[in-house]
Amino acid sequence: AIIKIAAVPANLMTGYRGKARVFDTLDASLEALRSGKINPGDACVVRFLGMKARFGTTAFTFQEELKGHHELFNSCAVITDGRFSGGSSGLSVGYVSPEAALGGPLGVVKEGDEIEIDVINRRITLCISDEEMAKRISEFRWEFPASNYQRYLRLFVKNVGSMAQGCVWDC
């Protein structure tokens, strides 16, 4: 995961804890923001934007719109397996790996889960027991909607690996 430390508001550098708001698409997260469904302090998890789920990571613009909501910008966290632009700011955690589609921790976050972020100590914690985490991971299944895409994209999704290992096509 990557956090642009210089862009994080000072009050969010340590001791952040928020309730997860979970979105499986960028559009769903933007709709929630625009319709006032994000509350101060929420941890906005926007997943399935990584290499496997979106063929090369989706440009993530949620935090840019969050800037227009001062109270939210200074109290919320944004966590995604997608990528940020160089101009991103706020408590934004991107490129989370392994991505949700590969069974990474973002895939098992549930609405209302508590998430802690300590930027200084480089720690992100999903506040559930080890047993609950193991259970959720063992039950997690992600299915790529193959019928909606051309054959070469289906091959890419079937074979691409994690960003942490360079997104190598495993043949």
Describe each PLM feature range:
Residues 1-171:
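Feature captures the catalytic cores and cofactor-binding loops of soluble hydro-lyases/lyases
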